Amino acid sequence: TICLNMIVKNESHIIKKTLTNIIKYVRLDYWVICDTGSTDNTVNIITSFFNELNIPGEIHNHEWKDFAHNRNLSLDLAYGKSDYLFIFDADDEIHGSFKIPSLTKDSYMVLFGGGYSYKRTSIINNRKKWKYFGVLHEVIVGQEEMTESMVITGEYHFVSGRTGSRNMNINKYTEDAQLLEDTFYKT
């Protein structure tokens, strides 16, 4: 079974398109999404979307702190509710002929393309504990003994979007720099 796991905030302008894109490629059995303070219609769009498809799930509300903190809350809330978690950002998209293989490993990386290419862990074994580290550009790490990871190959790529709410903030880079500086001096 696969559970969609996301954190969102003020994504009403893109969230239905994102969820429709996911459903085209991934058979979801459950979903756990954490909203970090939306003031728009994001939560209603999400719940209506999944209600129409009869896919059960949960929406939770948590105050925003940083990426690792909020992603970890989302992971904890989804723990054990499926065999695997499919982790996705609200403004990302899947292109091509993406197919999830038979899931036997503890983690799977997907290919991101566009101006340059890279891999990101996006599917994890939900019977094991995981933790994100990093206030920005966070990384997920298994917290117990893990089997090997696998890169899902094929004629597809994910696109890391730039249309989410956070990217609309003209002060994003200044705020990110301040957050990194503050975090540096705390350690």
Label every PLM stretch briefly.
Residues 68-76, 86-88, 92-187:
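Catalytic-site signature of metal-activated, phosphate-bearing donor transferases
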Residues 10-26, 30:
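Short, well-formed alpha-helical segments that are part of the catalytic scaffolds
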Residues 8-9, 36:
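Aromatic-flanked redox-active Cys/Sec active sites in thiol-based oxidoreductases
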Residues 36, 62, 82, 88-92:
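Short acidic donor-binding/metal-coordinating loop in glycosyltransferase active sites
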Residues 21, 33-46, 50, 63-64:
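A conserved acidic beta->alpha catalytic loop
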Residues 50-56:
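Short helix-capping segments at alpha-helix termini
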Residues 1-3, 30:
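Cell-envelope/extracellular polymer assembly enzymes that use nucleotide-activated donors
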